[in-house]
Amino acid sequence: MSDIAPVTNTPYIPPTPEVGLPLWLLAELTYRCPLQCPYCSNPLDFAKQGQELTTEQWFKVMQEAREMGAAQIGFSGGEPLVRQDLAELIAEARRLGFYTNLITSGIGLTKEKIIAFKEAGLDHIQISFQASDEQVNNMLAGSKKAFAQKLEMAKAVKKHGYPMVLNFVTHRHNIDRIDKIIELCLALEADFVELATCQFYGWAHLNRLGLLPTKDQLVRAEAVTNEYRVRLEAENHPCKLIFVTPDYYEERPKACMNGWGNIFLTVTPDGTALPCHGARQMPIQFPNVRDYSMQHIWYDSFGFNRFRGYDWMPEPCRSCDEKEKDFGGCRCQAFMLTGDAANADPVCSKSYHHGIITQARDESETATQTIEELAFRNDRNSRLIAKSS
């Protein structure tokens, strides 16, 4: 007999062309984190956010989301390992029938926890690294012991039968060593490697001048990655390399989250529900799971309906024949760079604000900011930012 809980309580509301199902639930369990990565996507003012949801409140979120059709859950943060109830949350997600992911720095992970999470039903662990070099990794992480811990836990994850999934955020300070990064991943017997060039939200946006690679750096890094792909394929090697470029070097925007409020739903540590993890910065009052059901949040709330469909679009998006491909791009990026979330994403060459992007590219060619000069993500800096805003 199956131990998966039936999904029957909530009346089924079929998806429409403008409102899909919330298939992917990101559970940001906490903003607490032992590391200080200067490219973290968490809000700059995370230190002033409210009290974290309780175990029971997360159970309710997962139950309601599953009843609506959510299929996959990612436990993230901050660092989700600081939550003492993580194994309980994993077990409940498994009982409900979710495919479960743990997105972690590996700091705080132990062999005992890896076993406990396996017993609870965890499907997938993704461990992030800052660099292939111990000194650079630890400098970016703000921890002298981070690299050694990550190596040990990556090996333990592999040993206990999880898919080996590694994530490296690349930027101007580590991208030139992408060959060393790939070699480290192969040595760790990684199954999947995400070489994700920094996306400029949260702390990464604050530090953009010191993080954005040059065009030449990106071209070289992608060429090296492709050389490894060819070699691995020829050897019938199982490792898959995923290279993610920053939109700052594109001429068309990404179809962010496959459309606003279409398949992706984030719940933040204090219960605020968002259509993407960067949306909290917008001047929109988003609903909280303490006050509303997930069904109301997804289908009826103003925040989730604000940029659905196409009627909200101004020019040049409104008359663009590509709007059904990219949905006008990223609303958060439009807000950060132009002050109006309804504007076309400035990444698009048709945007009236595309000059902001070309200027950023130009600035990357002459940037001299060192790692030590970056603003690191920590409570002190967050409180200073919150106080000044």
From Swiss-Prot:
Q: Metal-binding: present as a keyword of the record?
A: yes
Recorded catalytic activity of this chain's protein: [PQQ precursor protein] + S-adenosyl-L-methionine = E-Y cross-linked-[PQQ precursor protein] + 5'-deoxyadenosine + L-methionine + H(+)
Catalytic activity, EC: 1.21.98.4
User: Where does the chain bind [4Fe-4S] cluster?
Assistant: C33, C37, C40
Q: Alphabetically list the UniProt keywords.
A: 4Fe-4S, Iron, Iron-sulfur, Metal-binding, Oxidoreductase, PQQ biosynthesis, S-adenosyl-L-methionine
According to the record, how does the cofactor bind?
Binds 1 [4Fe-4S] cluster. The cluster is coordinated with 3 cysteines and an exchangeable S-adenosyl-L-methionine.
**Keyword Iron-sulfur carried by entry:** yes
One function term, GO molecular function aspect: S-adenosyl-L-methionine binding
User: What cofactor does its activity depend on?
Assistant: [4Fe-4S] cluster
Give any Pfam family that matches. SPASM
| Gene Ontology BP terms | pyrroloquinoline quinone biosynthetic process
* Radical SAM core domain sequence ranges: 19-235
The annotated pathway is: Cofactor biosynthesis; pyrroloquinoline quinone biosynthesis
Family statement = Belongs to the radical SAM superfamily. PqqE family.
Known function: Catalyzes the cross-linking of a glutamate residue and a tyrosine residue in the PqqA protein as part of the biosynthesis of pyrroloquinoline quinone (PQQ).
Per its UniProt record, what PANTHER family does this chain match? PQQA PEPTIDE CYCLASE, RADICAL SAM DOMAIN PROTEIN
How is the quaternary structure described?
Interacts with PqqD. The interaction is necessary for activity of PqqE.
Task: Kindly provide the name given to this protein in its UniProt entry.
Answer: PqqA peptide cyclase
Q: What organism is listed for this UniProt entry?
A: Pseudomonas savastanoi pv. phaseolicola (strain 1448A / Race 6)
